Amino acid sequence: MLSISNAPTVADTGERILAAAASCVVDFGVDRVTLAEIARRAGVSRPTVYRRWPDTKSIVAALLTRHVSEAMRDAPLLGDDRESLVRQIVTVADLLRRDRLVMSVLHSELAPIYITERLGTSQHMLIDALAARLAVAQRTGSVRAGDPVQMATMVLLIAQSTIQSAQIVEPILDADALAGELAHSLNGYLS
C-alpha cells in the first residue's frame, strides 16, 4: 500500500500526461494522437485526463505554450536595446524551429487553427512579452516610436513565418543565413 507521501501528486499526474502527449505527438504526429493513447502512456485513466483537459487539442495547446515558454527561458534577454531584443527573438525562433513537437504541430491539420484562425495562448504570451520589451527599448531610443502591442504582433508574424517556412527555403538559406536574414529584417522593421 502506498503511503500518502509516496502517492503521486496532482502536478506529477499532469506532468506525466503532458510528457505522454509530447511523446505521442513526436511518435505519431499531432493528427494521430488520441486521448486514449495519452492516458495509456501516462499510466492514468481517460477520466483522469479529462479532469485536466477537455480534449486532445487542449493538451497539444498546453504543450505548445510550454515549449514556447521554455524557448523564451532558454534565450534570455541580455540587454534593453533593440539589438539584444532581436538576438533573443532570433534565438527563440531558432529553438522553436528545431523543436520536433512545435514543427509537428505546424505541419499538421491543426496548423490552421494555430496559425490562421486565432491567436493562441502562446502567441498572446509572446505578444505581451515582446510589447513590454519593445516599450523599454523605445524608452532607450533604440526602437522607433509606435504602438508596442501592434509592433510586437508584427514581429510575431515575421518570426512565425520564418519558423514555418524555414524548411522550404533551406536549400537557399541554411540555419545561419536564415538567422542572419531574420535579424536583418527585424532590425530594419524596429529601427
Model regions: which residues?
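Hydrophobic/aromatic-rich alpha-helical bundle segments in the mid-to-C-terminal region
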Residues: S104, R139-H184
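Short hydrophobic/aromatic patch on the recognition helix
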Residues: A42-W53
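DNA major-groove recognition helix of helix-turn-helix
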Residues: W53, L64, A159
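Amphipathic alpha-helical packing segments from all-alpha helical-bundle domains
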Residues: I113-T140, V149-T153
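Basic, helix-initiating cap at the start of DNA-binding domains
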Residues: M1-F28, R32-R41, K57-A61, S69-E70
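Short linear capping/connector segments at secondary-structure termini
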Residues: L106-Y114
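Hydrophobic alpha-helical connector segments
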Residues: A62, R73-R100, I115, A152-V155, ...
